[in-house]
Regions:
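N-terminal secretory signal peptides
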Residues: 1-22, 26-42
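Detector for C-terminal structural segments
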Residues: 33-40, 295-297, 302-304, 359-362, ...
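N-terminal lobe/hinge region of extracytoplasmic solute-binding protein
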Residues: 94-102, 114-166, 197, 279-285, ...
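A structural "hinge/loop" feature
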Residues: 99-105, 118-135, 158, 185, ...
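Alpha-helical secondary-structure segments
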Residues: 115, 188-195, 223-229, 283, ...
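Gly/Pro-rich hinge or "lid" segments in bacterial periplasmic/extracellular proteins
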Residues: 122, 148-153, 245-310, 315, ...
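Ligand-site clamp/hinge motif
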Residues: 176, 272, 302-349, 481-486, ...
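Surface-exposed binding/hinge segments that line
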Residues: 209-263
């Protein structure tokens, strides 16, 4: 994936059942190359395909990479190492695979239709910069730079190379000369410049936070070259801004510039998406958009000219179904070929039907944010006491919910939100569950229990907590809330749980602030982008754009955050992130619940599925049907 014009198509696939392939990229990571600079400079070779039985090694170490961004991205992949097959693990009739780079042997075959179902995607509006959904854009569009499916190492994609100025403030991208839009017109630097301006300026943009340093509009040097002159060095320009989808100016430019937004704001909201199908460069051409159907769906045709080789299906249908039970019914009735997200409880319901179950690292975390400024809390000093927060964390039985809810498909020991494999401080762990120790810690902090076991505040009245959680979640934090509720009850604390629709929840965390714990999960982008969730200047009580909903303030953390977002050297950024992780593990702006695995169901007659920690449906063009 580090060639100037990479090809990850059929010629490079190693094909049969999902196995323990040690791919080119995994070889680089496991082989200990010191980082992305070494990765990009690696010399190439060719791998020899091997045939192996499907495998799953649940205890196998995951590949990591220590990123050091090279100014120029070029080079050839390192050769692949051979993998030794291990015994296949199964859950009922499901064959389990946990390799980040599965191995397949055989010959891909073309088929008619691939069907994919996912929950929680809003297909009511296809504005590509609002990102109300995500899967549809991975089908139609491509980014400038590709992030490796596990390590997140950046590599050329639509751009054949990128260069960084000596002062670290200017980025120049050279586009491949063989990229065509679905209408046959060439991709140009004008399209790239337009896309980045939209992401920066559209009031609907979900990723405007990646572009505050792009105060100047991009410079189109010539048709294949575009330059971005930033106002300062950036810690996430390559990993986040450069990984956004490129939009066609010809299709969207006139509408955007006409200013259809409030007070004449330029926006892509309201574009006639039902009449005009999105035009991209990606593996699938959109041919139908039916947001009013039950369920809502999109239909695609294969892009025969896709630069990474055409998909192995003539068409693809993508549906979104919010109810988990309905999604499982569709799977059991063979109405879908892939299903994600899937919980461990879901697996119990479908394990007697043949299929592949991929258990893959998710670029995600789970927590309950702590509200330090709940005006309705009768004991506001309670959660503001760090000793109390640490006591509550010690009193949470994480292994209990790991076994009961996740069946082990989670690393509940992980602390914080830095779920990047290259940046997480592996020395940090959540405390081991110890109810007696937690009770003693609360007592030492001045909180005693009465004869009935209720924990009393310093005013002699029982301590109670109010928790909020969304009614739809990517990961089952609503069930974690129930588990934590029982743990806190053992400490003498009653916690009420309110399950809310998204609009009501947003009003509670952004405007009324009348809660104590917000149970939460989130999928991350490739680079650190949590500045507004932690920095004290981004408290939504004073900053409408802020996401520091609990009003946490830590001066040392603020200083580190200001350094992290301006540090382009990822080795140095990793060191800063390590310090930051130590702070949030100790000072606890949240109770941390670990990093979940993604579970993806794939029909037994499908091969070629490549997990992607950034979005598990991103590599859909690699899949084929065996029969």
């Amino acid at each position: 994936m580090v060639d100037e014009t990479p090809s990850l198509g059929r010629a490079e696939e190693e094909i049969q059942g999902p196995g323990a392939r040690l791919s080119r990229r995994r070889f680089v990571a496991v082989g200990g190359l010191s980082g992305i600079a070494a990765l990009l400079a690696a010399c190439g070779g060719s791998s020899t395909p091997t045939t192996a039985a499907p495998t799953a090694n649940l205890s196998a170490p995951k590949p990591t990479a220590l990123p050091q961004l090279s100014p120029v991205a070029s080079g050839t992949p390192a050769p692949a190492a051979q993998a030794t097959p291990a015994a296949a693990a199964t859950i009922g009739k499901l064959v389990l695979n946990s390799d980040p780079y599965p191995k397949y042997t055989g010959t891909p075959k073309d088929s008619d239709t691939l069907t994919m179902i996912r929950g929680g995607e809003d297909l009511s509006d296809l504005n590509p910069d609002a990102l109300n959904s995500y899967s549809p854009y991975t089908f139609v569009y491509d980014p400038l730079l590709w992030m490796d499916e596990f390590t997140l190492n950046p590599a050329p994609w639509l751009a054949s190379k990128w260069e960084v100025s000596a002062d670290g403030k200017s980025y120049t991208y050279t586009l491949r000369n063989d990229i065509k839009w679905h209408d046959g017109t060439p991709l140009t630097a004008d399209d790239v410049a337009f896309s980045m301006i939209v992401y920066r300026d559209d009031p609907e943009s979900a990723v405007a936070r990646f572009f505050p340093l792009m105060k100047q509009d991009p410079t189109v040097v010539d048709p294949p070259t575009v330059r971005f002159d930033l106002s300062d060095t950036s810690g996430d320009w390559v990993l986040n801004a450069s990984n956004q989808f490129m939009l066609q100016k010809k299709q969207l430019g006139d509408y955007y510039n006409a200013g259809h937004g409030q007070n004449g704001a330029k926006t892509l909201k309201g574009f006639p998406y039902e009449q005009q199908m999105l035009i991209g460069t990606g593996p699938w051409k959109q041919v139908k958009y039916s947001p009013g159907s039950a369920p809502p769906y999109l239909q695609y045709q294969r892009n025969e000219n896709y630069f990474q080789n055409a998909p192995h299906f003539n068409q693809m249908i993508f549906k979104t179904i919010d109810q988990s039970s309905s999604r499982l019914t569709a799977w059991l009735n063979n109405e879908t070929d892939l299903l994600w997200p899937v919980t461990a409880t879901d697996v119990d319901q479908v394990k007697n039907q043949d299929g592949w179950l991929y258990s893959e690292h998710a670029l995600a975390f789970m927590c309950s944010w702590i509200n330090f400024k709940n005006a309705k809390q009768a004991h506001p000093e309670f959660l503001n006491d760090k000793a109390v927060r640490q006591a509550l964390s010690t009193g949470i039985d994480r292994k209990g919910y790991s076994d009961a809810i996740f069946k082990g498909f989670v690393d509940e020991t992980k602390v914080g939100s830095i779920a990047f494999s290259w940046a997480y401080d592996t020395d940090l762990k959540n405390p081991t569950y110890d109810q007696a120790k937690a009770q003693q810690m609360l007592s030492d902090a001045g909180y005693k229990t009465d004869s009935s076991g209720k924990l009393l505040g310093k005013d002699g009245k029982p301590v109670t907590l109010d928790a909020i959680v969304a009614n739809t979640n990517q990961y089952p934090v609503d069930k974690i809330a129930v588990s934590v509720q029982e743990d806190l009850r053992k400490l003498g604390i009653e916690m009420q749980i309110e399950t809310l629709d998204p609009a009501t929840l947003k009003n509670r965390w952004q405007k009324t602030f009348d809660w104590d714990l917000w149970f939460y999960s989130r999928i991350l982008f490739a680079g650190f982008s949590d500045y507004t969730y932690y920095h004290s200047a981004w408290d939504p009580r004073t900053n409408p754009q802020g996401r520091n909903a609990g009003g946490w303030k830590n001066t040392q953390a603020d200083t580190l955050l200001d350094q992290i977002i301006r540090q382009p050297d990822l080795t140095k950024q990793k060191a800063l992130l390590a310090q930051f992780q130590t702070i949030i593990a100790d000072d606890m702006p949240a109770l941390w619940y670990g990093f979940p695995d993604d579970l993806i169901l794939v029909k037994k007659n499908l091969l070629g599925y490549q997990p992607n920690t950034g979005w598990q449906y991103w590599d859909s063009w690699k899949i084929w049907r065996t029969s």
